[in-house]
């Protein structure tokens, strides 16, 4: 969710963070259906680092540049196969679907806040070991705690 604090306007779409080099490098290139906003967290507030290119983009996008206090320094609808540099230095860039700027009624100087959407992590298979011999003698079932204890001691 993106919020224009100055105007009280809310964009209810999903928000993802591009806070690593690889995520910033990948951006929205080759994404067919842009139905979320991507917030780029840049290492420093500069004009050069905040420039974007639209090479290999499959559709146009709305772009908002923010300074370190999250105030809008520039915004526009970016067209495919072009390069854009903000008017002033920026620390954050928000890229999203066309129409996002209109919903938020963005103007220079507006304060923008975001709430990243939690992404569900994929399950990762973990190798575990079970006792070689399972015995039901003298018990009412399998003692699961014994196998857990064995797994913990193997890792320790």
Curated annotation (Swiss-Prot):
Alphabetized InterPro entries for the sequence: DUF192 (IPR003795), Saro_0823-like_sf (IPR038695), UPF0127 (IPR022906)
Domain of life: Archaea
Coiled-coil boundaries: none
Family statement drawn from the similarity comment of this UniProt entry: Belongs to the UPF0127 family.
Annotated protein name in UniProt: UPF0127 protein TON_0581
Organism: Thermococcus onnurineus (strain NA1)
């Amino acid at each position: 969710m993106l919020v224009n604090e100055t105007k009280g306007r809310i964009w209810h779409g999903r928000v993802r963070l591009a806070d690593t080099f690889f995520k910033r490098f990948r951006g929205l290139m080759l994404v067919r259906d842009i139905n979320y906003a991507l917030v780029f967290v840049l290492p420093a507030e500069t004009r050069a680092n905040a420039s974007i290119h639209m090479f290999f983009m499959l559709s146009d996008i709305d772009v908002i540049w923010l300074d370190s206090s999250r105030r809008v320094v520039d915004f526009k609808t970016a067209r495919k196969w072009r390069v854009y540099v903000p008017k002033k230095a920026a620390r954050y860039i928000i890229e999203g679907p066309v129409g996002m700027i209109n919903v938020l009624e963005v103007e220079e100087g507006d304060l923008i806040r975001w709430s990243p959407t939690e992404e569900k992590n994929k399950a990762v298979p973990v190798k575990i070991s079970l006792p070689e011999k399972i015995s039901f003698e003298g018990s009412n079932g399998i003692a699961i705690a014994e196998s857990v204890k064995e797994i913990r001691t193997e890792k320790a």
